[in-house]
Amino acid sequence: MAANPSGQGFQNKNRVAILAELDKEKRKLLMQNQSSTSHPGASISLSRPSLTKDFRDHAEQQHIAAQQKAALQHAHAHSSGYFITQDSAFGNLILPVLPRLDPE
């Protein structure tokens, strides 16, 4: 049984059309970017992964900050000790502050 050549031809035409549309859009964006070089604030960055990464990092930072705040409030409410928020090599959100006692 042979492969359907008309179906394959349609797929190739569809791919070519999609690639042509993408190329046209890319050229349009590049032209906009080049025309706005006189206005540095109006330039369009074509690197979306860095924007997505920055957004993800910011969201992660906010989530960690919320967790730190909750852990700190819980520790202060249920303990007589003193705690601070600080990055820890072991992944702890808060660290206890231990007083130094003079040796007797």
From Swiss-Prot:
Coiled-coil intervals: none
GO cellular component, as recorded: nucleoplasm; nucleus; site of double-strand break; SOSS complex
Swiss-Prot/TrEMBL keywords: Acetylation, DNA damage, DNA repair, Nucleus, Phosphoprotein
Intracellular or extracellular location(s): Nucleus
Record-linked InterPro entries: SOSSC
One Pfam family per UniProt: SOSSC
Main location: nucleus
Any one Gene Ontology BP term: double-strand break repair via homologous recombination
Post-translational modification N-acetylalanine, affected residues: 2
List of residues that carry Phosphoserine: 50
Domain of life assignment: Eukaryota
Family as reported in the entry's similarity comment: Belongs to the SOSS-C family.
Described purpose of this protein according to its UniProt entry: Component of the SOSS complex, a multiprotein complex that functions downstream of the MRN complex to promote DNA repair and G2/M checkpoint. The SOSS complex associates with single-stranded DNA at DNA lesions and influences diverse endpoints in the cellular DNA damage response including cell-cycle checkpoint activation, recombinational repair and maintenance of genomic stability. Required for efficient homologous recombination-dependent repair of double-strand breaks (DSBs) and ATM-dependent signaling pathways.
Subunit structure: Component of the SOSS complex, composed of SOSS-B (SOSS-B1/NABP2 or SOSS-B2/NABP1), SOSS-A/INTS3 and SOSS-C/INIP. SOSS complexes containing SOSS-B1/NABP2 are more abundant than complexes containing SOSS-B2/NABP1. Interacts with INTS3; the interaction is direct.
Name this polypeptide is given: SOSS complex subunit C
Record organism: Mus musculus
Encoding gene per record: Inip
